[in-house]
Every structure is written in C-alpha cells, then in structure tokens.
C-alpha cells in the first residue's frame, strides 16, 4: 500500500483520512486513484480499483483484508468513471474474483466498448508503469475492462443490511458517478466535485462541463452526507464538509475566470496550456499523476471553461 506523502497531509498529523466509520477499508496499492473495500452483512464491494501497473498488489490487499474479515470473495465493484487511474486494475480483479459484478454508469459501459478508449487506457497505463515501476515490463491488460450492469441516477444496490445508491455526477466526465453508502452516510464522490490537494487547494478537474459540475455539486450537497470520501484523497473532516463544497464552487469559478482572462489576451491553445501548467502543475504532483495525464486533462479543462464562457 502506498505511503502517505506530504501532499496528502493537509489536515494535520492528527487526522486519519482513512478512519472510516464502519467496515470500509483502504486497499489501495501504488499511485493513482484510491480503492476502498466495503464489507457488507451479505456482500462485499469495492469502489474503484486504481491503476493497472499495481493491479496484482490491489488484489493481494483485497484478499488480505477479506481474510481478516472472514470472507473469501469480492462480490461487486463500482466504478466512479472510465479513466485508467481509477479502473485500470479491473482485469486483475476479474481474474482473481471471476464472479465479481462490475457496476458503472450507462455511458461508462458504452465507453469501455470503444476500441480507441482502450488504446488510450493502455497508453496511459503503460506510461504510469514506466514512471512508477520502471523495472517492470508487464503488459498492461485492457481486454477485461467492461461494465456488467449499468446504473442510472438513484439506483440502489443491496449489500445486505447496507445499500449503495448511485448518484449521477457529470462534469469531470459524462460517465461519472458518485456512490452513497447507507446506513453509514458515506458519500464516495467523483472527480466532478473536486479533489483536495496540498495547502487545502481544491483541484477542479472539470473536463466536460462546468454547468454539469454545478448540478453534481447541488445533488451531492443535498444528499447531506455525514462523511465525504474524495477521490485521490480519502475522508475529509466532518466539520469541513460545508466549507469543502464552497471551496469547490469557488475553484470552478476561478478556473473559468482564468481562461476568460487568457481569452481576452488573445492567447492561442498552446499558450493557454503553458500558462495553465505554470499555475497549477507542481513536480510533486507526479507522485500521483504523470505529467502526460495532467496535460491531457488541462487541455480539456480549458476547452470546458471556454464552452462555459460561450454559454453565458
């Protein structure tokens, strides 16, 4: 399991971002998206599974924790969206647990049926492997990337005494989903409602639509979660919940304003990307995201901001 690094210690040494209220456990391995295992009264589930290069380690972490809980199978997997850093390890999950059922949005299901999407995932997954595990030459698998059951907004899936509710949360992508776990009141958000970074900065990776992100923000706020678990981070303090939502909205407005200013200056796409990188990229971030992926996202964030300006 990856070690905590400076960029994650934003709430001080006394706060444990993985101290969940019930039988929820971090089984993350390596860099990239988090993987959270949920032990229900009847079924087990995982929220995302991380990158492919560390897929074998994720499986080991899952098996070890299942054994501690007296279980031996993973029943369900829920995907927040179709990006390689959140579900690249899925082929390893399927091989280790052949009966696992994969859930995601309808659009996520459709994307994973596209050959060009898998080509990109393989490319980015290989770049991540070369960066984080340079001695490895293990092939990055993509053939088993698929959603078995498509969920729509409001759908419920039972784990026994517990339920997981799907909440459509577009903005980051059109395939993004958040998931609410009851009765513990945990909201596992998507990147459509942001990520905490160093210095309590809120990253707003809105690749598709800032308007959709605001809709997702409204829905997630209205859910009224006791606990908020952010992608690429973990839990935030309960007394920070409302401030987090406020900071996320402000962060979105700040990014759109920055792009508006660049547009007024007459900057072209390359110049905008360079300025965006200068403002938001820090080399320490490469411990979690390769620069190639950052730049791909940055281009799309700028395009989404330009669309938001056109819609005003």
Write out the residue ranges for each language-model feature.
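Conserved beta-strand hairpin/beta-sheet module of binuclear metal-dependent hydrolase folds
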Residues: 8-67, 178-191
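A short catalytic or substrate-binding loop motif that flags glycine-/basic-rich loops and adjacent residues
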Residues: 28-31, 151, 170-173
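Metallo-beta-lactamase
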Residues: 49-53, 163-170, 174-242
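Active-site HxH/HxHxD metal-binding segment of metal-dependent hydrolases
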Residues: 53-56, 64-152
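Soluble or luminal CAZymes and related metallo-dependent hydrolases
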Residues: 54-57, 149, 208-212, 251, ...
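Short, electropositive alpha-helical surface patch
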Residues: 239-256
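C-terminal regulatory/interaction regions
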Residues: 258-312
């Amino acid at each position: 399991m990856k070690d905590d690094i400076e960029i994650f210690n934003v709430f001080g040494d006394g706060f444990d971002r993985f101290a969940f209220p019930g039988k929820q456990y971090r089984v993350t391995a390596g860099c990239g998206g988090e993987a959270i295992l949920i032990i229900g009264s009847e079924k087990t589930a995982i929220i995302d599974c991380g990158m492919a290069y560390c897929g074998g380690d994720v499986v080991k972490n899952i098996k070890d924790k299942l054994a501690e809980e007296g279980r031996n199978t993973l029943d369900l997997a829920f995907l927040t969206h179709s990006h390689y850093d959140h579900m690249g390890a899925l082929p390893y999950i399927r091989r280790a647990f052949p009966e696992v059922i994969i859930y995601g949005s309808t659009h996520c299901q459709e994307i994973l049926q596209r050959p060009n999407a898998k080509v990109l995932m393989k490319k980015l997954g290989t770049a991540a492997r070369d960066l984080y595990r340079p001695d490895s030459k293990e092939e990055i698998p993509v053939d088993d990337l698929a959603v078995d059951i498509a969920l729509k907004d409001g759908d419920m899936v039972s784990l026994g005494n517990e339920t997981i509710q799907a909440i459509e949360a577009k903005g980051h992508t059109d395939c993004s989903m958040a998931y609410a776990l009851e009765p513990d009141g945990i909201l596992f958000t998507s990147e459509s409602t942001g990520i905490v970074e160093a210095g309590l900065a809120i990253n707003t990776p809105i690749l598709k639509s800032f308007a959709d992100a605001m809709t997702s923000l409204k829905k997630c706020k209205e859910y009224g979660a006791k606990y908020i678990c952010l992608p690429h981070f973990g839990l935030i303090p309960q007394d920070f919940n409302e401030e987090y939502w406020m900071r996320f909205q402000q962060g979105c407005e700040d990014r759109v304003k920055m792009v508006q200013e660049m547009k007024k200056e007459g900057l072209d796409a390359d110049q905008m990307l360079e300025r965006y990188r200068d403002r938001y990229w820090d080399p320490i971030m490469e411990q979690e995201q390769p620069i190639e992926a950052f730049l791909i996202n940055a281009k799309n964030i700028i395009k989404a901001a330009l669309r938001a300006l056109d819609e005003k």
